[in-house]
Amino acid sequence: MPDALQIIVADDHPLFRDAIVLALQASLPGCRTLEASSFSTLEAMVREQDTLDLVLLDLSMPGANGFSSLVFLRGERPEVPVVVISSNDHPRTIRRAQQFGAAGFVPKSSPVAVIREAVQAVMDGGAWFPAQKAERSEEDAQLAARLAQLTPQQFRVLMCMADGLLNKQIAHELGLAENTVKVHVTAILRKLECHSRTQAAVLVKALQAEGGDDAATLPE
């Protein structure tokens, strides 16, 4: 008998998570769902789970910086498809989600049937995005390619750099030796083609999504 599908539902609104879990259980009977309400919780789950089949991701969880959680997932578990479910359905946000590696994008205002359709398409090895998308951005493509060169640990260090932490503070935050952090910072600046920590922080700001903040919208 095949193992049950393991799916993470990452969203900071409990009612929305409940609605998504019910939709998943109806369309994928027997699947095992794990719930994350923050980026730190998601990060821990991804590390702990040997087998993971899908992540449904809200972009605006506490601890996340725009598309940073998506970029982290693609770096940490590139074999696991990610479907972004967001109330920020600006055309450029949808296109950027695709360029940063999402397998699908579903607006939170979508009815349950659409969410199920998107999940099934992705689980079948395909992709699912709304019909109307912004044009491809070469700038975003270059940013995605640079970020893809970072190891998961380097990406964590980069997020700390973007928060203005010094090497000593980053070492304490991540449980690393300060010299190790220095080595990571040097590698990060080289891979991102940046001459300073400030330039690297500006690149992280470029991960911000278009439009306003996400808000919980329950599927119909």
Predicted regions and their residues:
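Conserved acidic segment of CheY-like receiver
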Residues: 3-16, 20-24, 39, 55, ...
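Acidic, metal-coordinating helix/loop segments flanking the phosphotransfer/catalytic sites
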Residues: 35-54
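Acidic catalytic/metal-coordinating carboxylates
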Residues: 37-38, 62-68
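Active-site residues of response regulator receiver
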Residues: 58-59, 86
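Short amphipathic alpha-helix used as the core "switch/output" element in two-component signaling
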Residues: 67-79, 203
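Short, flexible helix-to-coil linker/hinge segments that flank and couple to helix-turn-helix
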Residues: 94-99, 104-152, 156, 206-209
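Recognition helix of helix-turn-helix DNA-binding domains
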Residues: 164-199
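Basic, Lys/Arg-enriched C-terminal extension of HTH/homeodomain DNA-binding domains
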Residues: 189-220
